[in-house]
Amino acid sequence: TTTWMPTTVTAPLEDIYKAIANVAECKDTLNSARILGMFIEGPYITSKHKGAHPEEHIRPLNKEEIEKMSEYNTVKSIIIAPEKEDAPKFTKWITQDLKIKVSLGHSSANYEEACACFDMGADAGVHTYCAMEQLHHRNPNLLGAIMTRNDVYAELIADGIHVSLPAMKILLQNKPKDKALLVSDAIQGTGLKDG
């Protein structure tokens, strides 16, 4: 690994702010893999597809909170669920004014809600297949938007556990090669040692 992004999960806001400040303080001083910036995964997600995120800290989109997260110029990407109130407006503001990338995930959004956020500047679907509604022929939802839009990245946890090999092949055969991102999603709960 040469570059990585420390990632927060849904937590009390003060813990998220503290994590951002800590990364800002040390990101240019480490003699190791380069920290690109921070990825804020939650708290602006949906309870139905929260995954490992604690439900009690899931929040509505809030301008003041996001502005505070951006103060250190350390946050480079944030997840939002596109069904959140005013999500397209927030997406445009975050991407254009704050210059932070918006990814969509942990969501129950329908296709139209997802496309509205992609149209406003969101550029990726996070954990494709996971923590979202599954593809349905009458409601292709967020997954359908990720698969059919060649202007957005599909982030895929390609560990063979989160997503089956045939499902990975379906996605990779339907996305331009430069729009598929393979990621790890390892957290302490995997039981693996550091590294």
Residue ranges of each PLM-predicted region?
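Divalent metal-dependent hydrolysis catalytic cores, especially in the metallo-beta-lactamase
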Residues: 1-19, 33-46, 72-83, 100-101, ...
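Generic structural signal for hydrophobic
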Residues: 1, 69, 94-95, 117, ...
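Short helix-capping segments at alpha-helix termini
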Residues: 27-33, 97-99, 175-176
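Active-site-adjacent C-terminal substructures of enzyme catalytic domains
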Residues: 113-195
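Short, small-residue-enriched loops and turns at beta-alpha junctions
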Residues: 11-13, 46, 52-56, 84-86, ...
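Conserved phosphate-binding/catalytic loop of the ribokinase/pfkB sugar-kinase fold
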Residues: 46-71
